[in-house]
């Protein structure tokens, strides 16, 4: 039996830019087989869309929470429809 796939958009607030969050997210997602993207926002927050099993998503978030220098003070989360055919995880250009 296969695990149910989920897609969620997260928006992180706190000390989240200039501390390696995007690259850590990419490494964790790629290692775990999750897909999606991450980018910096002009207001100092970071947005990430992540697709995978509940366990994969939880593990990526846990990796970020346990990372040195990254200090997530607040997180907004939104459920999204699945992106069929999506491959890999990318760091997108900043949203300025």
Which residues does each PLM region occupy?
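Intrinsically disordered, low-complexity, mixed-charge
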Residues: 1-96
């Amino acid at each position: 039996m296969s695990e149910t796939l989920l897609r969620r958009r997260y928006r992180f607030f706190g000390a989240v830019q200039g501390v390696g969050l995007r690259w850590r997210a990419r490494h964790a997602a790629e290692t775990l087989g999750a897909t999606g993207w991450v980018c910096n926002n002009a207001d100092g927050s970071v947005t990430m869309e992540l697709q995978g099993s509940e366990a994969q998503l939880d593990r990526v978030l846990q990796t970020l929470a346990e990372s040195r220098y990254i200090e997530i003070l607040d997180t907004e989360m939104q459920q999204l429809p699945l992106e069929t055919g999506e491959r890999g995880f990318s760091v997108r250009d900043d949203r300025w």
